[in-house]
């Protein structure tokens, strides 16, 4: 184990800056997460990237936003700008449940304290900095700002909100994975350009008047419905989102413009996907992989989850309707080299408390490493949000060979007893039949090796629902494929004399889902002998198709009306079907089935199950409508559904690693 000094972390105090011999810093980052010097934490990635580019950087983690703002003043004025890194998860998903109850724990804070970050830290921190240092630029990054770069629906305010630049007063957003644009911005500002003149950096968002738009509004620009029009017309908001999502998933995107408050929000197209060399350089930076020494003796839950995990790639071409990964990372897969991955695993092996077990060797999805289009020219003109829905694209190379090579190289290292695949396996990719029989053979090999060598006892997969109509709106494969995969999983377990479980994830109250769909879900999962655990109520989060459908009532691609359960009563009526096997739920479920005209399902659910004694006080032990079934926050019982905004955030903390 390498011995680290205080100066091995980026400085967080004036004293630490002086220890480095600096008299000022170029960039000061304010983070709403605890400072963990690890490639899964966005502030660390941006700080290390700027350091490698020759700039001096300091981090102020979780500043106190009350009182005299001393945490915002303690490092003084930066030479270039303040950066806001609001955290790996959307702050409102982090703080509140789907039922808008305060969560009992903040996974990104020391000892899980839930009072270390404000609501919307992007806005709170920026307003304080602009009050204290009005002439210093403030640049936003991270999942919270990235997904609020244009007009968006805010579930917690239950209203349509403007581009977050309007509410915060910041000067610029760097959206998505920000290593390349942040360095380019520093170069521009270091050369003396005012930030108001920096308009040509890809992957940035800024506000300006129409006459100030570089090159004016051209034929290649996409002019969205104005914020004011979206307030008046929900169909306009739905129509906007189709363009926003398409441009987020194109290799050569167009510039987006949206009028708001007598100005335009200008969204420059993103950089091309990072090359392997570029991604390696980011992951090879000199991270300590440890929390800052200031947290000695304190537990940071998110770090505990990922400290023995390694990320293989960025991007996801699944295109799930409730997920923000493609909006933040894009659908094109950027892979690390085998060398870079193995070197990081060696660093994990050297950690003093490592016992030989890697908790996760994956990415946004577990088995997309090395996959790409066979014909790059076809990908260059494609604007499909998903490469595998409604069918696997014939141009997609689904070869798992490169991923197997990574597994074999890692498992061969001295000190590795076993590497687990924590979650996110796309079984539709494993079951897809290619025209190339060699690829099919590798898929079968991968499936067997996954089940026999990389499961910790429970393999988590995400069918999400059983209704094909709901799954179509979710952009997920038919539930029949889950049944096929479960048969394969069970067969291999029998052949190898293993006693492992497959754990399915499900969502209730997704747009298009009604009580009857949930009732049939209960029947089908009962027939498969599941007592569901990993379940959650749909939470609308910014910049997903599902959220736009939920808010507007229209499918953004067809503009056809779509039903959504919105009231607490409607949501509870759906959610209770997950727990049909609990005696305290039975009476309410039977009543609901009779109400919707599906009394025939009562027999299918409860045949042979003695009816409980419906005494006077029966059902008093039912949980409140939005409380978790384990007695903590609410019924969102999925463990670390992060990265996908708790799968609707696809920023979370297990195998989902959003950064600037």
Residue ranges and their predicted role:
Residues 19, 27-31, 73, 201-204, ...:
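Flexible, glycine-rich loop/tail regions that form catalytic "lids" or insertion modules at the edges
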Residues 25-31, 38-79:
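Nucleic acid-processing catalytic cores of prokaryotic defense/repair systems
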Residues 29, 45, 59-60, 65-68, ...:
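Conserved SAM/AdoMet-binding glycine-rich loop
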Residues 30-35, 296-324, 357:
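N-terminal pre-triad scaffold of radical SAM enzymes
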Residues 42, 61-260, 267-273:
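Glycine-rich beta-alpha loop elements in corrinoid/cobalamin-binding modules
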Residues 66, 196-249, 271-274, 336, ...:
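Terminal amphipathic helices with adjacent charged low-complexity linkers/tails
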Residues 90-99, 147-149, 179-184, 209-213, ...:
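Flexible glycine/acidic-rich beta-alpha junction loops that bind and position SAM and/or redox cofactors
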Residues 171, 282, 316, 341, ...:
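Conserved, mostly hydrophobic/aromatic
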């Amino acid at each position: 184990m390498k011995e680290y000094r205080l100066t091995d972390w980026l400085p967080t105090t004036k004293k630490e800056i002086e220890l480095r011999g600096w008299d000022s810093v170029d960039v000061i980052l304010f983070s709403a997460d605890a400072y963990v010097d690890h490639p899964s934490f966005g502030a660390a990635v941006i700080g290390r990237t700027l350091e490698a580019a020759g700039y001096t950087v300091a981090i102020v983690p979780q500043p106190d936003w009350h009182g005299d703002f001393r945490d915002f003043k303690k490092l003084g004025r930066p030479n270039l700008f303040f950066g806001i890194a609001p955290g790996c998860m959307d702050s409102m998903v982090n703080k509140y449940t789907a039922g808008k109850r305060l969560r009992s724990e903040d996974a990104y804070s020391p000892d899980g304290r839930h009072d270390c970050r404000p609501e919307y830290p992007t806005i709170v921190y920026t307003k304080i900095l602009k009050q204290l240092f009005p002439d210093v630029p403030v640049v936003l990054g991270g999942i919270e700002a990235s997904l609020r770069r244009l007009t968006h629906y805010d579930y917690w305010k239950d209203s349509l909100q403007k581009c977050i630049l309007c509410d915060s007063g910041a000067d610029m957003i760097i959206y998505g994975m920000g290593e390349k644009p942040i360095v380019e911005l520093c170069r521009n500002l270091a050369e003396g350009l005012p930030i108001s003149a920096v308009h040509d950096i890809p992957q940035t968002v800024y506000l300006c008047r129409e006459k100030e738009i570089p090159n004016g509004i051209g034929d290649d620009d996409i002019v969205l419905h104005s914020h004011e029009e979206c307030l008046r017309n929900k169909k306009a908001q739905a129509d906007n989102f189709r363009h926003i999502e398409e441009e987020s998933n194109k290799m050569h995107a167009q510039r987006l413009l949206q009028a708001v408050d007598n100005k335009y929000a200008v969204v420059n197209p993103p950089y091309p996907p990072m090359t392997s060399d570029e991604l390696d350089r980011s992951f090879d930076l000199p991270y300590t992989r440890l929390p800052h020494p200031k947290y000695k003796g304190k537990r940071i839950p998110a770090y505990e989850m990922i400290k023995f995990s390694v990320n293989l790639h960025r991007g996801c071409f699944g295109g799930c309707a409730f997920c923000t990964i493609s909006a933040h990372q894009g659908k094109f897969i950027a892979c690390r080299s085998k060398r870079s991955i193995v070197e990081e695993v060696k660093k994990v092996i050297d950690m003093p408390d490592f016992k030989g077990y890697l908790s996760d060797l994956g990415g946004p999805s577990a088995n997309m490493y090395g996959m790409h289009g066979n014909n790059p020219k076809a990908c260059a003109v494609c604007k499909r949000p998903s490469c595998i829905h409604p069918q696997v694209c014939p141009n997609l190379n689904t070869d798992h060979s490169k991923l197997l090579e990574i597994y074999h190289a890692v498992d061969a290292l001295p000190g590795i007893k076993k590497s687990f695949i924590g979650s996110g396996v796309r079984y539709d990719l494993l079951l897809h039949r290619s025209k190339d029989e060699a690829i099919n053979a590798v898929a079968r090999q991968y499936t067997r090796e996954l089940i026999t060598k990389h499961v910790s006892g429970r393999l988590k997969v995400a069918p999400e629902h059983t209704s094909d109509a709901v799954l179509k709106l979710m952009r997920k494969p038919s539930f029949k494929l889950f049944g096929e995969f479960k048969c394969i999983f069970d067969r291999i377990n029998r052949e190898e004399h293993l006693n492992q479980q497959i754990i399915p994830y499900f969502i209730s109250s997704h747009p298009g889902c009604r009580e009857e769909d949930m009732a049939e879900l209960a029947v089908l999962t009962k027939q498969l002998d599941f007592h569901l655990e990993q379940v959650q109520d749909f939470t609308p989060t910014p910049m997903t198709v599902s959220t736009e459908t939920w808010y507007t009532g229209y499918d953004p691609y067809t503009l056809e009306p779509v039903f959504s359960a919105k009231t607490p009563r409607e949501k509870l009526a759906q959610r209770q079907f997950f727990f049909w096997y609990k005696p305290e739920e039975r009476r309410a479920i039977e009543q609901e089935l009779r109400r919707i005209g599906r009394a025939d399902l009562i027999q299918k659910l409860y045949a042979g199950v003695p009816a409980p004694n419906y005494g006077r006080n029966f059902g008093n032990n039912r949980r409140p409508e939005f409380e978790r079934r384990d007695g903590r926050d609410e019924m969102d019982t999925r463990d670390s559904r992060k990265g996908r905004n708790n799968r609707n955030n696809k920023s979370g903390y297990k195998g989902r690693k959003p950064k600037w």
